[in-house]
């Protein structure tokens, strides 16, 4: 069996929690941004599988999971990119493949655009881009109110078939989201939308994506209620060297809802010369 090691490193002045396993070509898994999210919540089942072929690193991004949140730091894409690069530097990783889920995909893209030599290629799952009206699924994440019912409501938008949502999963995310300081941290990282207007969500601009030199594999659930499938089409049209694989009857959790296919596609893509 593959040994997954969880440890703490210093990266960009943040005490950083990460999971690591396997040998070979380095692949970094970047988690999404809902309440109670962490690398473990997004990736625990796929880390040992991907580690059969790759050196897998799955960090908790600054402010999320068990990684430090500094009360006086300004958490924005600039800080998150600097933290990600800090992780690569701390681990001595010159160039890595990235698998990014949702917000993690946007972070991977932002890093690839600002530090192109550090990123080898990208797998983007349910990743926002361009501009689009706030979805009910995104709003439910941002409006999480600190109750177990609120968590159940927020998580209900992720999969297409919500029978995969277990009480244990809700409980685990709820505990993570309500540990001391976590709710305040989440409010700081992801401010709730004001009033009931439909604010615009802004991802990486499509014009910027058109300049991306990297290969990208875009994976998206057709029924995604958090980041609509149309985003994947726009991304595929914009990123010159991209391929798109869409799953029917699948929501925002491709790596959980279509785990076997996800593993096959990512393994094949990351192993290419």
Please report, for each region that a protein language model flagged, where it lies by residue.
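Catalytic active-site module of serine/aspartate enzymes centered on a nucleophile-bearing elbow/loop
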Residues: 242-273
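Active-site loop/oxyanion-hole signature of alpha/beta-hydrolase fold enzymes
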Residues: 48, 58-99, 264
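Short beta-strand/loop motif that positions the catalytic acidic residue
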Residues: 212, 218-220
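Acidic catalytic loop of the alpha/beta-hydrolase fold
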Residues: 223-227
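Conserved alpha/beta-hydrolase catalytic His-Asp/Glu region
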Residues: 145-210
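Conserved HGGG/HGGXW glycine-rich cap/lid loop of the alpha/beta-hydrolase fold
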Residues: 14-66
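Flexible "cap/lid" loop of the alpha/beta hydrolase fold
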Residues: 109-113, 119-153
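Gly/Ala-rich beta-loop-alpha elbow adjacent to hydrolase catalytic centers
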Residues: 100, 104, 108
